Regions:
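Polar, low-complexity loop segments and adjacent catalytic/binding residues used for recognizing
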Residues: 2-272
């Protein structure tokens, strides 16, 4: 399937209900003190600091000492994405992440933001499946999976374009759209693309938005300490109302192969 490319120390959680809409808005500034609002599956955990004793303030989706480690961190409460069976609320999310290889050159595999029908990890496996799906269910339209992957290993059997890309996944880890990781800046001569190495260990910020009127998914990434780039990395037209149920769970998933790599989420906001 292809789609058209359109060229908490502090935790705040609010649920606003009216006859017209149900809105969810939350913000995790960091995850150092833990919270029962996040459920962990597989090898995911509150990340250890470099001393191995204290917490880093991040969610770790994989563990350094477990080969082929993979896991999910999911919000325990489902989010209402639809007021009825057909319509879909617009939504936007942003988060800071880092991918840090511990062995070279065998890094892998990556992490993803996910919207899934269950807060369990019974369908996910490691390696290129990123703890999203597995060999058996990959591509099944009944998965009702929406994900944005940040992939650092080229798995040609799964259609990966290179070892440093961002992709939109619909019911499959074979991305419907994928592009080289990076961001756009405006110069005197027009737009200039600058590549970002996802597995550099640097902290990057990702912004993911869905416009329900135009059925457009946009993905933007940049350095965490800089403002959001004005031009999205990806703008793709797809009707997510056919994928997302009225209530879904959201969170993150990640995996690695033989190469040891740390996949961490440092903060997270969501609003619909």
């Amino acid at each position: 399937m292809k789609i058209q490319i359109l060229c908490f120390t502090t935790l705040f959680l609010a649920i606003v209900t009216s006859q017209v809409t149900t809105a969810y808005k939350f913000k995790f500034d960091y995850f150092g003190n833990g919270t029962d609002l996040i459920s962990f599956h597989g090898d995911a955990e509150y990340g250890p600091d470099t001393d191995g004793m204290s917490r880093s303030g991040a969610i770790a989706l994989t563990r350094d000492n477990i080969p082929y480690s993979h896991g999910r961190a999911i919000l325990t409460t489902p989010i209402t994405f639809k007021p009825n069976a057909s319509a879909l609320y617009p939504f936007k999310t942003s988060f800071t992440f880092s991918i840090t290889p511990k062995t070279n050159p065998n890094q892998g595999h990556g992490l993803a933001f996910i919207v899934v029908p269950s807060n369990q990890n019974d369908a996910g496996s490691g390696l290129g499946y990123l703890s999203l799906l597995n060999r058996t269910n990959n591509g099944n339209p009944n998965n009702h999976l929406f994900a944005v992957e940040f992939d650092v290993f080229q798995d040609k059997s799964l259609g990966d374009m290179n070892d440093n890309h961002v992709g939109i996944d619909i019911n499959s880890v074979d991305s419907v759209v994928s592009v080289k990781s990076g961001y756009w800046v405006m110069t005197r001569n027009g737009w200039l693309f600058k590549e970002l190495k996802l597995s550099s260990g640097d902290r990057y910020k990702a912004w993911i938005e869905y416009n329900n009127n135009y059925k457009v998914i946009s993905v933007t990434i940049g350095f965490a300490h800089l403002k959001k780039p004005n031009r999205p990395l990806i703008e793709a037209k797809f009707d997510l109302s056919k994928v997302i149920h009225e209530q879904m769970y959201t969170g993150f998933a990640g995996s690695m192969g033989r190469g040891v790599e740390r996949h961490e989420i440092w903060d997270w906001t969501f609003q619909n």
